């Protein structure tokens, strides 16, 4: 089947919130999950005094003030290669919790605050726990500046909450040139 035709056929079967935007032939040993070189996630927070129904299910509603500049500075502590044991779901069966985060930042556009995280791989709930830790810093239940110590501790109880799934988006999957 030609790639272009396969892509059109896929899109007739996919739900409206998912679209195939490209398609190409790959070698037989290619695996969509295990052949990827990295991923980029975005966690969206609607930071406004009043809930916006158009963002329901697409972003976490957070009515308390957020200092995106402060959160961005804290998020930079996630950059690099670390043991992310403190930022994974308790009981996770992954043997090697070491991951490399090569992009991490917080931006604001109006009422929308976004955490963007890209890395070579992610543990279960890792991005949601990173987002929850930053939000807990904003409300004072996790000390500002404590991310390096939390990483070093490898202790899940030292990190913040697991932010709700509603704000999380897998934005891009990176593959090596085939």
Kindly give the residue locations of the regions a language model identified.
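Structured-RNA-binding interfaces characteristic of tRNA pseudouridine synthases
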Residues: 1-178
């Amino acid at each position: 089947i030609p790639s272009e035709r396969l892509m059109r056929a896929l899109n007739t079967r996919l739900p409206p919130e998912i679209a195939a935007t490209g398609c190409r032939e790959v070698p037989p040993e290619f695996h969509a999950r295990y052949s990827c070189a990295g991923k980029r996630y975005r966690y969206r927070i609607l930071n406004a005094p009043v809930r916006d129904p158009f963002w329901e299910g697409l972003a976490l509603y957070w009515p308390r003030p957020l200092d995106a500049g402060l959160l961005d500075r804290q998020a930079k502590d996630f950059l690099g290669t670390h043991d992310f044991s403190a930022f994974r779901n308790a009981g996770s069966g992954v043997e090697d919790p070491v991951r490399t985060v090569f992009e991490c930042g917080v931006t604001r556009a109006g009422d929308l605050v976004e955490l963007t995280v890209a890395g070579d791989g992610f543990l279960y709930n890792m991005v949601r726990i990173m987002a929850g830790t930053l939000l807990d810093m904003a409300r004072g239940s996790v000390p500002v500046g404590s991310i390096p110590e939390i990483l070093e501790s490898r202790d899940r109880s030292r990190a913040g909450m697991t932010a709700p799934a509603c704000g999380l988006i897998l934005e891009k999957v990176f593959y090596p040139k085939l």
